[in-house]
């Protein structure tokens, strides 16, 4: 019973996380952590570590899929990533000094709101419009936004993907596919940094649960990324919005349960 229950929980956690990653560049931590904590009674710090490591491969595969379809801004992604990484470490250290109950609620609510935004006000920016911004201005914007995202990411251990998507589409004016592609590209590295630091501070995870989460998240992220790159902008906005709203509601439900 226990084994089957663990597989079922990790399957659905991985499915939610993978779809969120492939469609919206959402951090797997937002879905996997609450499920592992609520149903498997796992230590919150360890659950976030497992979720972040599930994120690494899922984001890498998604980023590769977006890159293959020319929907990835590597240059500005690298600039933003540098500032995100530095401040994720700062945020993570601050978080290890505060009680873990404060984490998570904020990012879940944001996921839900962002989902509604994509359904009600789709991002219809085109690649042509994106070219209109000067390289220097975009680089500076990338650094400033990266600092903000990194600190909040490290502190909450989630919400980074959502914040990145919000900032890339709203502040930096990216077209949706490029925003998601760039977001998952950055997240591959931020999740890796986060996972390694979590395991170094908190010790090794339950390897069985870890392996299941990694495999299931990877599988669903690949499916979602392939679909997202083939879809037209309107359909993609709607699909992304629905995935985010459903995940937001489900996770809020878990938080109430626990």
Annotated model-derived regions:
Residues 23-32, 157-167:
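Transmembrane helix boundary and interhelical junction motifs in multipass membrane proteins
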């Amino acid at each position: 019973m226990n084994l089957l229950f663990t597989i079922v929980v990790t399957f659905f956690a991985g499915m939610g996380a993978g779809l969120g990653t492939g469609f919206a560049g959402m951090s797997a931590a937002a879905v996997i952590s609450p499920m592992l904590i609520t149903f498997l009674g796992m230590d919150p710090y360890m659950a976030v570590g497992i979720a972040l490591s599930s994120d690494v491969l899922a984001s890498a595969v998604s980023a590769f899929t977006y890159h293959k379809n020319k929907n990835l801004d590597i240059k500005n992604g690298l600039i933003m990533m540098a500032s995100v990484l530095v401040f994720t470490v700062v945020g993570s250290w601050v978080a290890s000094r505060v009680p873990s109950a404060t984490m998570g609620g904020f990012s879940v609510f944001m996921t839900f709101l962002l989902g509604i935004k994509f359904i009600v006000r789709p991002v219809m920016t085109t690649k042509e419009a994106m070219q209109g911004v000067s390289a220097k201005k975009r680089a500076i914007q990338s650094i400033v936004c990266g600092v903000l995202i990194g600190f909040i990411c490290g502190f909450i251990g989630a919400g980074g993907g959502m914040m990145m998507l919000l900032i890339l589409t709203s502040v930096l004016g990216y077209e949706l596919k490029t925003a998601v592609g760039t977001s998952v590209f950055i997240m591959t590295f931020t999740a890796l940094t986060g996972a390694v630091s979590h395991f170094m501070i908190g010790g090794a995870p339950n390897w069985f649960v870890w392996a299941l989460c990694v495999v299931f998240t990877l599988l669903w992220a690949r499916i979602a990324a392939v679909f997202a790159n083939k879809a037209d902008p309107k359909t993609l906005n709607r699909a992304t919005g629905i995935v985010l709203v459903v995940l937001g509601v489900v996770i809020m439900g878990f938080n109430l349960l626990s």
